[in-house]
Amino acid sequence: MIRFSVLILCLLICVGCGPQQVTVEDHQSTPAHIELQPPVTIESFVRRGEPFESTYTAVPERVVAMWQNSIETIIALGEGDRIVAGMGIPDRKYVRPEYREAYDTIPYKDLKYANLESVLMMKPDLLVGWKSTFTNKMLQTPTFWQARQANVYIAESSLGAQSALTMDMEYKYIRDLGGIFNRNMEAERLIQEMQQSVAYTVAQTANEKPPKALFIEVEGKHFRLYGHKTLAGNIGDSLHADVIDTETPSISMEDVIEQNPDVIFLIVSDGEYSQADVIMNYVLTQPGLQGVNALRNKRVHFLPLLAVYSPGIRLLDGIDIVSHGLYPNLYPEGVPDLIH
């Protein structure tokens, strides 16, 4: 079975296909010029332990946004008309329905990155992306862009797994973009919606035994494990699940049987959506797993990677899917399906 993990997908998009030369016909009307008084200074990181600061004297007007978290979070803040290029979304059908109209107005949209020359011609004043975006082999470093009067913001959760990934990182991401775009109230509203969703679930299930939850991704004949230090695991912990974890990055079939999870969340990337049912069937038909509670009670659910890896606004989807999967009595409508 082919596994398109986030790393492989990044390599496919960013290296295998390579940045491409593009011509952008910008038919957007010029967004309003908004001065920021006082100026806003935001800290971001090139890598763990290597911070850099960006100062904004006005709301950015020509934004190049890489990956779904950047594009959709900026749209959710009400500033989609400031995006001149949105890269990294395979198909508009993966965009939240309420964001598609704004997404459609972005002048340049593609799964592939435009090359450096093309991005320079877009004259951006802000670039938002992941750590992998801003290297000498890709779209250059933050220093390169700051020398050209353009700021860079890198999602902290894309820096790597040297430390735990948490919901608080995503709240900071949304809050930082809210400050950059002078949309602080909107950012807090989005964050509060997520926090209230968690608080409601926790309050309503306070007297229940924590369900044992397993977060996995299929890797050939093995399972990659998403434990406490991953965002998926952090969501589970925050919702008072008993999250299965080990000292290794994978979990064997034998260990799954021994742990006997009540619910399994099957993580799939957008590159795997067309094979999602095949992947699910692979798990459901494993002879050794037939006695596991999650399979016996039909509690194996898809969890899209976009909701648990540097998700930004899509963290709400991750919270909803996990809470519905953990507590079916509280949410009898079933687990949201973002894949089909």
Task: Label the model's feature ranges.
Residues S54, P60-E61, V128-S132, S157-A164, ...:
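Second-shell loop/turn segments in exported
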Residues A164-G179, E188, L266-H340:
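Structured C-terminal subdomain patch of bacterial secreted/periplasmic proteins
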